[in-house]
């Protein structure tokens, strides 16, 4: 008896583009072994599942914080809270967040900031129907720098500090390394408009990480932070907000350098506006920073950020999607589709936007997923509606397969 099975949909996205007439995808164990035109004839011993909606690869969220549930600093569930939470509490939060991700069609997450390397122990939970995890451990930052409370502090002026930090990550078995090249909104006192590292120590850190066979991505909210990360040879830029006094926009020369270096940018777009607190309830340091930046209309700021990503596309820069899930109240886990929708709102074609959360994202995370292609992992997603004409369909998952095993279904089954 054949161990193969197939799934057929009249509408499909293969990871790079929409396929006219749909596809039939043949699966054996955890891999795709064949991809055929929609109405192909299958051997009689290959069971077929026919689905409505749009079939596509499972989504890949390139920027999550599994130890946090998305609240402001100091509140239970925040990144700052996670820095002092016990192991059991962290494990519960991580598991809850992984469940939220897979329920939203996300089959791989890249965690870019935990506590005590706690997330690494949650890799390999596919048997429980939970997403694959690519993990960085605690992000590297300077004393009192952004997210210092997560435990990844290094002192660039202390001999051996960078070497010890990289050696620990290699010993722990991280999949990627993250460094905070600028300050951030979530850490009072950090410099969101400057650079946290001088070029020489950051270049030394990048060289150490590369010598260990790992990639390094840099948190960059400011123009100076992005400039030093590019000059140091980092592999990717997270946020790339390019904040400066009076606004946020990437200088053309910086975009040209990012493109020439072949770097990947994750703009971490997307949020749930209904979860934003009233401005009067926001922490004072965030209100102060918004005033320094001249941001008076939150909605217009986000719309401008979406439009700004067109400049990345125009310069040929590789873009991937990650929500920064768990970082604040408006970024709960399982909302990656909003990142893709923001690209479309900014002017991206739907197929290119969806690719940032499938094939491009999988490549950047180093996983053999993100494509409906023979040899790739059978991480599959069905969404309700025609994704090619309605990007919000990405937020309506009806079935999810992880490594060929159905782990979520909201669709009716025969009998």
What are these regions (language model features)?
Residues 10, 349, 354-359, 374-415:
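C-terminal cap of metal-dependent C-N hydrolases
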Residues 54-125, 229-232:
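Metal-associated gating/positioning segment near the N- to mid-region
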Residues 78-92, 147-164, 215-217:
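Active-site mouth loops of central-metabolism enzymes
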Residues 90-120, 130-139, 174-187, 214-215, ...:
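Divalent metal-dependent hydrolysis catalytic cores, especially in the metallo-beta-lactamase
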Residues 147-203, 235-238:
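Active-site gating/metal-coordination segments in enzymes
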Residues 188-303, 320, 325-327, 347, ...:
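Active-site core of metal-dependent hydrolases
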Residues 288-293, 302-386:
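His/Asp/Glu-enriched, well-ordered alpha-helical/loop segment
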């Amino acid at each position: 008896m054949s161990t193969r099975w197939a799934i057929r949909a009249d509408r499909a996205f293969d990871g790079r583009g929409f396929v006219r007439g749909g596809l039939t995808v043949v699966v054996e164990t955890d891999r795709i072994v064949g991809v055929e035109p929609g109405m192909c004839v299958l051997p009689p011993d290959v069971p077929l599942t026919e689905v409505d909606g749009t079939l596509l690869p499972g989504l890949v969220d390139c920027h999550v914080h599994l130890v946090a549930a998305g609240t402001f600093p100091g509140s239970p569930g925040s990144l700052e809270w996670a820095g002092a939470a016990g192991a059991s509490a962290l494990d519960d939060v991580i598991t809850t967040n992984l469940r939220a991700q897979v329920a939203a069609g996300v089959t791989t997450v890249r965690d870019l900031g935990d506590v005590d390397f706690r997330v690494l122990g949650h890799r390999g939970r596919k048997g429980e129907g939970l997403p694959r995890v690519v993990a960085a451990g605690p992000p590297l930052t300077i004393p009192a720098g952004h997210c210092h409370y997560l435990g990844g502090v290094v002192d660039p002026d202390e001999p051996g500090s960078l070497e010890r930090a990289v050696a620990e990550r290699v010993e722990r078995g991280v999949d990627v390394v993250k460094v905070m090249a600028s300050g951030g909104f979530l850490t009072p006192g950090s410099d969101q408009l400057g650079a946290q590292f001088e070029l020489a120590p950051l270049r030394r850190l990048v060289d150490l990480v590369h010598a260990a066979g790992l990639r390094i991505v840099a948190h960059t909210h400011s123009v100076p932070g992005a400039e030093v990360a590019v000059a140091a040879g980092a592999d990717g830029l997270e946020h790339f907000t390019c904040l400066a006094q009076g606004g946020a926009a990437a200088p053309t020369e910086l975009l040209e350098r990012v493109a020439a270096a072949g770097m990947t940018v994750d703009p971490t777009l997307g949020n749930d506006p209904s979860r934003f607190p009233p401005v009067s309830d926001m922490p004072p340091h965030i209100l102060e920073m918004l005033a320094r930046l001249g941001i008076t209309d939150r909605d217009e700021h986000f719309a401008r950020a979406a439009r700004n990503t067109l400049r990345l596309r125009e310069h040929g820069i590789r873009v991937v999607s990650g929500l920064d899930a768990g970082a604040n109240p408006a970024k709960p886990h399982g909302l990656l589709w909003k990142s893709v929708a923001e690209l479309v709102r900014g002017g991206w074609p739907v197929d290119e936007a969806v690719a940032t959360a499938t094939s491009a994202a999988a490549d950047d995370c180093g996983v053999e997923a993100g494509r409906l292609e023979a040899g790739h992992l059978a991480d599959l997603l069905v969404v309700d509606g025609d994704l090619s004409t309605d990007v919000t369909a990405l937020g309506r998952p009806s079935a999810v397969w992880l490594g060929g095993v159905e782990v979520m279904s909201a669709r009716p089954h025969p009998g």
